[in-house]
Each structure stands twice: as structure tokens, then as C-alpha cells.
Amino acid sequence: CGRRRGSLAWPDASSPSANPRPGAGAAESSACTTSGWSRWRTSLLVAGALLGLQWLPQLAGLWVACFGFGTGACIILALMFMGLRTENPRQAAALSGMAQCVGYLLAAFGPPLVGGLRDRSQDWNPALTVCLVLSLTMAAAGMLAGRNRRIRSASTAASTPAAG
């Protein structure tokens, strides 16, 4: 696989390396072969945008654009990893349902909580700091989710003898 696949936003996101699934398509190959840096740099873009809003608010347009690109890329990668890291469609559906439940709960309660924090402190810095910590947590989760591993079902794990 000597070809490089990428996009305008992340031209090196699909560095060539061994793909765990033979015959994988471009998107699957890209997600499976991204380097450690590529997997979590979208979350770092979000973190950088939040830091920029705190330190250089006069460039808010730039930081909001970076935040939008970063969060958009994060959701695409999250959805892609759910399908790529599971063994079958049923497992992918279960993982997707769990992740979307948590995601929608955060989407429902996060903005009012952050808004309440902003109202209570009369400053955006504490709210932006909370979001920064969450984006760094998301970067760590992205590193774990992007590892070249599969989520094994309980029945597969039980039928496979333990190594060692």
C-alpha cells in the first residue's frame, strides 16, 4: 500500500503501514493506519482553539473555525472507530448505541452546566478551562480508541484460550 490517502485538512492522516483488514477501503485504511499523532491531533486542535479563546480573544473567528474543524473531525473519527474496532455488525450497533447514549447525555446537559458555570463566575475562563480538560480527555480516549486492536465479544473471548 504505497499510496497516500488524505484530505485537504489532514493530508498526512493516512500514513502507509500494515492494515489489519485486507481489502479495506480508503476511509477504513485511513483510520486503521493513522499514526499516533494523527489519531488525537483533532482533539488537540480543539484544545488549541479553547486556549486561543482564553489567551487571544481578539482572534475569536480563527479559534471558532479551528474548534469547528476539530470537533467535526473528532465525531467522524469516533463514528469510524466504532465500526472499525468491532468484529461484527451486532457488536458495532451495541457499541454505537452505548456511545451515542453517553454523547447525547453530554450534549443535553453540557451546555446548561457550562452556561451555569459561566453565569456563576461571571467569566468565560472557568468554563473554557473545563472544556479544555474535556478536550484533553478526549485526546487520551482517541489514542486508546485508535490503537490497532479489536473489541472482542464475550463469546469470542471465552472460546479463545488464554495466552501465557
Swiss-Prot record:
Residues 1-30 are annotated as: Disordered. InterPro entries: MFS_Cyanate_Porter (IPR052524), MFS_trans_sf (IPR036259). Keywords: Cell membrane, Membrane, Transmembrane, Transmembrane helix, Transport. The chain crosses the membrane at residues 62-82, 97-117, 126-146. Its main location: membrane. It is a multi-pass membrane protein. It comes from the Bacteria. One of its GO terms (cellular component) is plasma membrane. The keyword Disulfide bond does not apply. Gene3D superfamilies: MFS general substrate transporter like domains (1.20.1250.20). It is found in: Cell membrane. The keyword Signal does not apply. Belongs to the major facilitator superfamily. Cyanate porter (TC 2.A.1.17) family. May be involved in uptake of anionic 4-hydroxy-benzoate. This is Putative anionic 4-hydroxy-benzoate permease. It comes from Thauera aromatica. The lineage of its organism: Bacteria, Pseudomonadati, Pseudomonadota, Betaproteobacteria, Rhodocyclales.
